[in-house]
Amino acid sequence: LFAFWPCCVKAVRVLSSPEDKGKSFGWFEGARGVASAIMTPLAVIAFRFGMNADGKHDIAGMRQVIVFYSVITVFSGLLVLWKMRDDGSKIDKSEQVTFKDIGTVLRMPAIWIIGLVTFCNYVFTLSVYYFTPYGTSLLGMSVTAGAVLAAAKRYVTPVSNVGGGYLADKFGTSRLLLISFLVMAIGTAAILLLPLNDSSTIVFVIVFLIIYFFYNVNYPLTWAMMDEGAIPERVSGTAAGIISTIGYLPEVFVSLLAGALIDGHPGVAGYRMFFGFLIAMLLLGAVFVVVWQRFLRKHGLGKGSAAKTEAQAGAQPAAKDAAA
């Protein structure tokens, strides 16, 4: 991920038009969701094939899964090499990113706000795995129903990713982000208020799928924020790396916190404490989106700002040459 992820984000920005950033990142994340939904059952087949071929040993099955994903990775790399070619022009020295540019990016307020929005959204990414155990252990939902719900998430993902991208381009990225954070927080609170019996199962499933839909609306839009904040495409890779460093920090502590709370306080108490933390982080995400909206208004930024800023920057040297 060190070099791969920033390259992906920059490629999507460069290949998409200023008016279609939301749709572009929505299709990007949606396609990843479809690929995941396809590859997961294939990986299970590879695992079973390995076990059957070697006396039903788990190690043999895992070996086949590793080989399967390795082949997919190599194939994807060759596909990129074939389809995504450079135009042959050399990068001008003025366009090359230097260590000075890294410092410039770090001083951009937009980078830190986007990073904090991503941080709050990623807390939910790591927390989503605890909803199904809550349903099965406390609401009486069957394990089979829990497995079906977990599988259904994979098919909600591409629909919400792509749909969210179109809605963002129509109504505004920051507005949709704010709505999504609030819906996720309210939905999580509603789940905590459900009676602890099997009569709540259907409501739980419906509310969870609504929450998950809006979470996947949010996920690609955090990257579309770069265009609103006038972050130059030239430094997109650097910006994505810094945003990811900030935004993915929950990876360090969320799972540990969940384990400590849920195991340390058996029953509903641990889940209430952890989901309470999650609600607080979602509301904090909404606050950061409001800060973002004020930042955009203060600086006269918004949809297509990056393209406008770069066009103005490119026009200045041309005007000087013409005057000379």
Predicted regions and their residues:
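A late C-terminal transmembrane helix in Major Facilitator Superfamily
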Residues: 230-266
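Extracytoplasmic gate region of multi-pass secondary transporters
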Residues: 36, 109-161, 219, 254-255
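Glycine-rich segments within core transmembrane alpha-helices of 12-TM secondary carriers
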Residues: 23-48, 244-255
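C-terminal transmembrane helical hairpin of 12-TM major facilitator-type secondary transporters
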Residues: 174-222
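A membrane-interface helix-boundary motif in multi-pass transporters
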Residues: 48-70, 260-282
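C-terminal membrane-cytosol helix-exit motif in multi-pass small-molecule transporters
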Residues: 48, 70-90, 288-293
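Helix-to-loop junctions at the C-terminal end of transmembrane segments
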Residues: 159-173, 262-263
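Juxtamembrane intracellular "pre-TM" segments in multi-pass secondary transporters
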Residues: 86-114, 311
